Amino acid sequence: MRSLGLDIGDRRIGVALSDPEGILASPFTIINRRDESLDIEAITDIISQQQVGQIVVGLPRSLDGSLGRQAEKVKEFTQKLCSHTRVPVEYRDERLTTVLAERLVQAVKTKKTREKVRHDALAAALILQGYLDEGREPKLA
């Protein structure tokens, strides 16, 4: 079962997909926000085409852990998305993933490679990978 990771922003939505085994997350695409219904349609098309069975949405929290206005926007959009799909959704704390993604993109040596890697999709992959890794950690008795 593939999992879909979303990094929802005001201008773009970063999208990541896991492999079918749910082990590795990779950046997939970026949706440039235009209209909410078109954004939802683009995501539901990906869900259908890629046979997604789980959605992980990055929830932007403040450093103190509180939810701000951006987190509320993400939750509102996610609720609307949920009304268009039966795929279960989970939230994952995304504090600092965009910053880490930007630093990783800057660390890439060539300009040509940097241009191909968009930090929004990479942030979505980091969010999704954290979720996948968390599910595989051995539980101590």
Can you say where each PLM-predicted feature lies in the sequence?
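Phosphate- and other anionic-substrate recognition elements at nucleic-acid/protein interfaces
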Residues: 2-4, 11-141
